[in-house]
């Protein structure tokens, strides 16, 4: 028989750096989940992605056990890494902070495809380009139609 799901918790934690301090401790502790056990499992599974911010969805059950799924880093974080800037523009429509190519957009879109709600790489590229635009990061050139 399947376990009874008590709820979901969504967090963004740096890979290999989960610890019982906020935001992890209070979020899990209030639900009765073993914080140290989660931290050990998360850190073990994310050692290869150390330092990158990773979204994690924790499913906890009525018997206080849990499972979790680690997603790919957010598009905004990947865009900042590719553009080599620390933050987006305060005025994205007026002031651009960086410029990236469509090839870089394609790479991010292919990496993020599993988490996005789209069926084609082109649709994912448009989503990534929209995020870049809202952050003040310009995309060089025209959208590649036949690629």
UniProtKB/Swiss-Prot annotation:
The lineage of its organism: Bacteria, Pseudomonadati, Bacteroidota, Bacteroidia, Bacteroidales. HAMAP family: Ribosomal_uL11. Forms part of the ribosomal stalk which helps the ribosome interact with GTP-bound translation factors. One or more lysine residues are methylated. GO terms for cellular component: cytosolic large ribosomal subunit. Pfam families: Ribosomal_L11 (PF00298), Ribosomal_L11_N (PF03946). It comes from Bacteroides fragilis (strain ATCC 25285 / DSM 2151 / CCUG 4856 / JCM 11019 / LMG 10263 / NCTC 9343 / Onslow / VPI 2553 / EN-2). One of its GO terms (biological process) is translation. This is Large ribosomal subunit protein uL11. Belongs to the universal ribosomal protein uL11 family. Keywords: Methylation, Ribonucleoprotein, Ribosomal protein, RNA-binding, rRNA-binding. One of its GO terms (molecular function) is large ribosomal subunit rRNA binding.
């Amino acid at each position: 028989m399947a376990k009874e799901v008590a709820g979901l918790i969504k967090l963004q934690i740096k890979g290999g750096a989960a610890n019982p301090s906020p935001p992890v401790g209070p979020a899990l502790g209030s639900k009765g989940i073993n914080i140290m056990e989660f931290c050990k499992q998360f850190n073990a599974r994310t050692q290869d992605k150390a330092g990158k911010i990773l979204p994690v969805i924790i499913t906890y059950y009525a018997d206080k056990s849990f499972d979790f799924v680690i997603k790919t880093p957010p598009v905004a974080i990947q865009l900042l890494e590719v553009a080599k800037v620390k933050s987006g523009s305060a005025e994205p429509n007026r002031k651009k902070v960086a410029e990236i190519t469509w090839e870089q957009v394609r790479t991010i879109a292919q990496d993020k495809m599993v988490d996005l709600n789209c069926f084609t790489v082109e649709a994912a590229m448009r989503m990534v380009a929209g995020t870049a635009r809202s952050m003040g990061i310009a995309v060089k050139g025209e959208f590649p139609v036949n690629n």
